[in-house]
């Protein structure tokens, strides 16, 4: 069974301020690229509704794994924890949008097209000890689209939103968090590579990079670290599906939810060798027998959805521009 949503024409996905040609909300400055997180929530209900309408026996589904666009993330506020939990505790919610309407501390989800963080990237690189140092720690030379740059950008431009943020979730984590009704689930260490904050070899948040990202921000590195999720293997089960989805769509209470990963790490799962993807970005994924890092920073060191190391060369916006 396969199903996609025609987001341009589907009335269930209308009215979120999404520009179909650019695939982002109208930017407020050059290089800003954000999508409406409420669209992701509406799309999940729409997709599961279509799945149920197709006649699929949802009760027979034993586990769900997901992929989300790499680097994209959302900022959740104080109300998020109880709102997500309500999906477990109250099976009779009207819909996901209603249940989660007050969750977001910031109304946009910055995505991989972000290109307005040059100053933030240079700041983080310098504070970490320079190009060689940040590559050695994170496996990447802090590209503009990486979440570390965006967190600093948001904190400087929208300090109230940053202060109100309690949890930062990558888009790959948002969907499984909704499915289990828990916004404190782990982030897989594969997609954490695309944040620019994880120590690549240790597979933990890097304290030096945290200090660099949060330098001069309220609460410093301690406050930023508190907003980030714990890290886990990409195949970690983060719980069973929430009561809302059992009642509304017929899933079994035993259906397990996997923490998921980014779209690139999950694509790499398809090949044990190298993989060339000619999508919205042109990417070359090169298998590595160990956690190897390109000291020149031309490639990004990552892990795939099975936890295997690989290097990732990217021509951003490939098919959109060529």
What does each of the following model-derived ranges do?
Residues 1-12:
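N-terminal basic/disordered segments at the start of proteins
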Residues 3-5, 17-19, 109, 313:
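Short hydrophobic alpha-helix segments
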Residues 14-31:
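A short small-residue
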Residues 8, 23-24, 306:
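Compositionally biased, intrinsically disordered/low-complexity regions enriched for serine, proline
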Residues 27-38, 42, 46-322:
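Glycine-rich phosphate-binding/catalytic subdomain of phosphoryl-transfer
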Residues 9-10, 21, 69-71:
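Short active-site-proximal "capping" loops at secondary-structure junctions
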